[in-house]
Amino acid sequence: MKKVVLAFSGGLDTSFCVKYLKDDKGMEVHSVLVDTGGFTDEEVADIEKKAYDLGVKTHYTARVADKYYKDCIRFLIFGNVLKNNTYPLSVSAERIFQAVAVAEYAKSIGATAIAHGSTGAGNDQVRFDMAFRIIVPDAEIITPIRDLKLSREAEIEYLKGKGVQREWHKSTYSINQGLWGTSVGGKETLNSWDYLPEEAYPTQLTKKKPSEITLEFIKGELKAVNNRRFKNPVEAIRRVHALAAPYAIGRDTHVGDTIIGIKGRVGFEAPAPLIIIKSHHLLEKHVLTKWQQYWKQNLAEWYGMLLHEGHFNEPVLRDIEAYFEHSQNTVTGTVRVRLAPYNFQVLGIQSDYDLMSDVFGSYGEMNNAWSGDDVRGFSKIASNQVMIHQKIQELAEKKK
């Protein structure tokens, strides 16, 4: 009997896959849930029960939140990565780690086939296929939902015919909650004009009085929130979320180019990622040189694009990560942030590495490290080439 590992979430599509692979294809199904930090213990237990009720041979939960942070999220912070200057790659980064974990599990148990429940309409199918082909290249990739092109109603009828009686209620909005943000999809995101209403977002406004928090970074990593230290950065991220989410902070709509070549739109709420990235970015403005910031921003654009499009295993990402890590040697300090309903403001920083030091001068006020003559000479040299260019153009025009 062929052994197949299935990426399993407990939803309609992956539940269909279990019965289809087991009953129709005669395969031994081993389901895998990958928890990147977005599930509660109760949800994990419920998904495991659903898997066994459907008839899987074994079910495995891969807990990869710490690995997800260490191998991905911290580099998204180091690079201040926001896709199209908006989206913190909440789902795209998570999906890649889910795909990698499923593939690694399939390899560990010697499975000859590997399956996922993605449709043929989005990015996830590519991310899963790529990870599977790279990590378990000899395994057959099976994609029942994509290949059979079944409607939701057809899947429900199939499962009913197999004796699976569950309430397959389709929510008005598709919610994907994760450690690095939550995506929100609905009819409004299927066109270019409408916007998600208040009730679409899973976190509602419950706090209205503004407050201030502090975030302490050491070599680019968040280590303390409001002077409370965290050994595990994942818990620090969750703490920022707990403080900011009641203000309904971090909502936006991402518009981008999908891997399959069409434009796509998705809403999201990501209070912790946006606050952490913007705070980290302000600290970097104070402690990095102009050219460090310039080149890091350029590399971050490429890093985010490659990661979003499923190229996590591309070696150049390791090269960019090495640059990011080296750039964080002086990114140490405390950032002050104001929280208010629907918005936040990064107020200021304190750092021993702050290059905005009054020892050398205050912008527009006083110079302590140079004289007027120094500036006069510098300005002459700095403008020399363009002055020569201008003169040559004038002489050439006179010869006409």
Locate the predicted segments by residue.
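Nucleotide-activated chemistry modules centered on ATP-dependent adenylation/adenylyltransferase
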Residues: M1-K400
